[in-house]
Each structure stands twice: as structure tokens, then as C-alpha cells.
């Protein structure tokens, strides 16, 4: 395992760490009952009835959990 030759200053450590950022997730758009619905494509989404009650979960066009 590599061992650093010199101590890295607090300022350099924090400057390096500040570059690590979370990327914005890409939302997918879907029209449901005339209204746009945005969801994450890699997650299961809830399918609701006309009253807003949850019927089941769907992922990649299949019923899950």
C-alpha cells in the first residue's frame, strides 16, 4: 500500500474534497391522466388508481413488490 511522503495540509485536503459532488439524477417524463409525471427510470414507481390510492409498484413495465 502506498504511504504519503509528506503531510497534506488541511486546506489542500479540503480543496480536494470540495470537488467531489453528487450528480443530478436524470428524470424521465410520463403523461398520466393528462398531467406530466416525473420519475427516476431506475426505480420502481407507484401505479395509482383514479382516487390516488396505490394499486401496485411497476419496474421496467413489470409488476413488482
From Swiss-Prot:
Do you know which SUPFAM superfamilies this protein is assigned to?
Zn-binding ribosomal proteins (SSF57829)
State a single Gene Ontology molecular function: structural constituent of ribosome
Report the InterPro entries cross-referenced here: Ribosomal_bL32, Ribosomal_zn-bd
| Transmembrane annotation, as ranges | none
Q: Which GO terms describe its biological process?
A: translation
* Superkingdom field: Bacteria
Pfam families on file: Ribosomal_L32p
Q: Does the keyword rRNA-binding apply?
A: no
Which keywords does the record carry? Answer: Ribonucleoprotein, Ribosomal protein
| Cellular component aspect of the GO annotation | large ribosomal subunit
> What's the family?
Belongs to the bacterial ribosomal protein bL32 family.
| Protein's name according to its UniProt entry | Large ribosomal subunit protein bL32
Q: Which organism is it from?
A: Tropheryma whipplei (strain Twist)
Q: Which gene encodes it?
A: rpmF
